[in-house]
């Protein structure tokens, strides 16, 4: 059995005389086939999706929208600083008709306790670089310089940092002196003595403030209430309170040097008089009972 290898040769006609005409017909047929394929190619459609839950990833959203039709490209917008999703994405379907159907059906759809907003984007508004690097997997942004600066250092590493700052400070001062600029700026490294003095000052000021507060509180507790506000609540009329009021009235009268005479009656005598007035009623009742008997 003979085996054929290599690419297929050109199509030849059975009659060698009609070979030229046959090749022209073949070329025309091929053009028609290519034109039909171009006409059959579907125009893609892009859908703008909004109000997406923050916990969803690209793979989950891609698999969810792929049930409507073939998804050619997909992009979920994320923050460059944190890497978290911004809540909106762009989905490109193979056919424009499918994209319009998805936008109509999924608009105002309750998805993860949120109402989705889906809008069809016309091809004029779609940017060329909208789906740039869409197939590259997402990686959380890392800041090595920040991690390096915030890491815990040993004493030797701290001393090295201080030496570097001192060298930079010297170079700056030399450059300014060469250019004839008289400019004094604070040192890049704070001295320990200054920090200790500041802490001592802060503690002393705090102690003084606390002492003043204590004095104010003690003064308010020791001072008795000598006066009574007219607009305030009425005090309870106890015997001691009445005697105090009478003595105050007497002092005021003495100061004015009036000739009026004030009779001070003790409260006990008033009680005795009330008891004496009440006793005859009991005696009359007893007399009536004895007379009836």
From Swiss-Prot:
Q: In the record, which positions carry N-acetylalanine?
A: 2
Q: Which residues carry this modification: Phosphothreonine?
A: 223, 234, 238, 279
Q: Where is this cross-link: Glycyl lysine isopeptide (Lys-Gly) (interchain with G-Cter in SUMO1)?
A: 271
Query: Which residues are annotated with the PTM Omega-N-methylated arginine?
Result: 244-245
Q: Provide the positions where the record notes the PTM Phosphoserine.
A: 145, 218, 230, 247
Q: Does the keyword RNA-binding apply?
A: yes
Q: How does it assemble?
A: Binds to the FHA domain of MKI67; this interaction is enhanced in mitosis.
Q: What name has this protein been given in UniProt?
A: MKI67 FHA domain-interacting nucleolar phosphoprotein
Species assigned in the record: Homo sapiens
């Amino acid at each position: 059995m003979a085996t054929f290898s290599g690419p297929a040769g050109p199509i030849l006609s059975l009659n060698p005389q009609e070979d030229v005409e046959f090749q022209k017909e073949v070329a025309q047929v091929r053009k028609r086939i290519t034109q039909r394929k171009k006409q059959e190619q579907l125009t893609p459609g892009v859908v703008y999706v909004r109000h997406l839950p923050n916990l969803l990833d690209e793979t989950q959203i891609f698999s969810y929208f792929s049930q409507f039709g073939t998804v050619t490209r997909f992009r979920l917008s994320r923050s460059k600083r944190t890497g978290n999703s911004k809540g909106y994405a762009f989905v490109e379907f193979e056919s424009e008709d499918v994209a319009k159907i998805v936008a109509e059906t999924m608009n105002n759809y309750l998805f993860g306790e949120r109402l989705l907003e889906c809008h069809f984007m016309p091809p004029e508004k779609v940017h060329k670089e909208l789906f740039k690097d869409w197939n590259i997997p997402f990686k959380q942004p890392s800041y090595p310089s920040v991690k390096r600066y915030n890491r815990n250092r040993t004493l030797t590493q701290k001393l090295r940092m201080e030496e570097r700052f001192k060298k930079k400070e010297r170079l700056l001062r030399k450059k300014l002196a060469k250019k004839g600029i008289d400019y004094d700026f604070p040192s890049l490294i704070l001295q320990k003595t200054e920090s200790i003095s500041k802490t001592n000052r802060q503690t002393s000021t705090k102690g003084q403030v606390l002492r003043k507060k204590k004095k104010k509180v003690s003064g308010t507790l020791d001072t008795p209430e000598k006066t009574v506000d007219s607009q305030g609540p009425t005090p309870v009329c106890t015997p001691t309170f009445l005697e105090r009021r009478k003595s105050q009235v007497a002092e005021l009268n003495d100061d004015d040097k009036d000739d009026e005479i004030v009779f001070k009656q003790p409260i006990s005598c008033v009680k005795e008089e009330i008891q004496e007035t009440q006793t005859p009623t009991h005696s009359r009742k007893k007399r009536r009972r004895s007379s009836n008997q």
